[in-house]
Amino acid sequence: MTLKIAFFTLILLVSIERVYSSDEEYRLLKDLREGYDPVERPVADHRKPVNVKLRLILQQLVDVDERNQVITLVVWNQYTWNDYKLRWSPEEYGNITTLQIPHGTLWKPDILLFNSANEHFDASFPVHMVVSSNGDVLFAPPGIVSFSCSLSMTWFPYDQQVCYLKFGSWTYGKKLDLQIDDSDLPDGHKMDLQYYIPNGEFDLLATPAFRKSTTFLDETYVELYFHMHLKRRTMYYGLNWIVPSILISLSNILGFTMPPECGEKITLQITNFLSVMVFLAMVSEVAPPTSESIPIIAAFFSLSIVILGLSICASLIIVNIFFRHPKTHRMGDWTRYVFLEWLPWFLLMSRPEHTFCRPRREEEKNDEEAGGDGTKLLENQQHQPRPRLLVNSQLVMDSTVPYLEEIIGYLKVFKAKLDDDEEEEEEILNWRFMAMVIDRLSLFLFTGLIFGTTALIFAFCPNLFTDSPIVDIE
């Protein structure tokens, strides 16, 4: 047991000895610190600027908050510059070529992200600086940065966004020459993407960058703009938003294939109406409340809601017409011509054979003429001279004429009632057939509206089949 303790103690002492710097490194650090001031700019001639290169290493696109117009990234800001006071000859210091010096002990540029949306503005982690023997200083602080971006939601979810990160010195003007470090980077990219983790919602198409000089209070400042061209992946929204909405609209169309008197189709259409309202509410949760434009998917859902609302109104009208009665509603001549003759022909509808009744006035006139002839016939027979042998028959006839006239009257009333019933039944069938015609017309009309509006909206979407940017980044 004692031997084990001694062995681990020896290993610990060796490790501690290795952690401590050597005499050469200690002497080198002492010589470099002598006469060094971290406030002083690292230039021999104060009239010349400090050349600082910035290389933006993008690791991950964490979040795109459309509602708050904020994008969150994990980046490494790699700054490089040369400090003439930090040069040494490696042969004089045990072949030491690099040093790791804590943050805050050397001069560093006051470069910030101007459009930062972080709570503390600068979210970079203070790491050590790496100094080479030729005076080159490497400072690469990692950080989770959030920056504001004006996101255009017009073509959501088939949208493309172009956002930028604006870097620049906060106080140094012409005294700091800020450059883009794009060495060994592919065309179209000014960000280093060798450690980039692809995002599940957006594709990163390009990362151009530009250098721009601005003047503020008679001082010229250099600013770097790193753009990000993002294209949204639409499979999620297509499968979970658009396809269900289209299926709901199609099921609403199928409601017009049900019998006109069926009230369940109104229940189906109201359910579909409320379902699309839920999808529209989901869009409102994503889009910013002060959006300058309406997202295309919101327009699609809004048009679907309008079409569904109109289909509900059409179904109510169809049911109302189907149950109309001739005693309460009279069909006009133009209505009869349009909905019973012209539209059925136009919609290729065939009506089973039916018997049309003659106008009532002609029937009554014929009945009156028929009734009058019968009465006159009886009267003529009553007053016509008859042979003597038929005297008894004449007496019988005279006694039965009133009864026959009463029977004829009852027959005329019964026939008129049958004619009225037939005419009423025919009128009821006309109203029902008119409801069927409007139902068929609604089927064709709303089918065309749904497919037409869907094709029209997505046909005008400029980013559906192209990767071209929607914002000019020059």
Curated annotation (Swiss-Prot):
Residues 1-21 form the signal peptide. It comes from Caenorhabditis elegans. This is Neuronal acetylcholine receptor subunit eat-2. The keyword Metal-binding does not apply. Residues 324-440 are cytoplasmic. Expressed in pharyngeal muscle. NCBIfam families: LIC. Disruption phenotype: Worms exhibit a lack of MC neurotransmission possibly explaining the observed reduction in pharyngeal pumping rate. Mutants show differences in their pharyngeal responses to nicotine. A variety of mutants show an increase in lifespan ranging from 29-57% longer than wild-type. Extended self-fertile reproductive span, fast body movement, and a longer pharyngeal pumping span. The strongest allele (ad1113) shows retarded growth. Animals generally have smaller nucleoli. Neuronal AChR seems to be composed of two different type of subunits: alpha and beta. Glycans are attached at N95. GO terms for cellular component: acetylcholine-gated channel complex; neuromuscular junction; neuron projection; plasma membrane; postsynaptic membrane; synapse. GO terms for biological process: action potential; chemical synaptic transmission; determination of adult lifespan; larval feeding behavior; monoatomic ion transmembrane transport; multicellular organismal reproductive process; negative regulation of gene expression; nematode pharyngeal pumping.
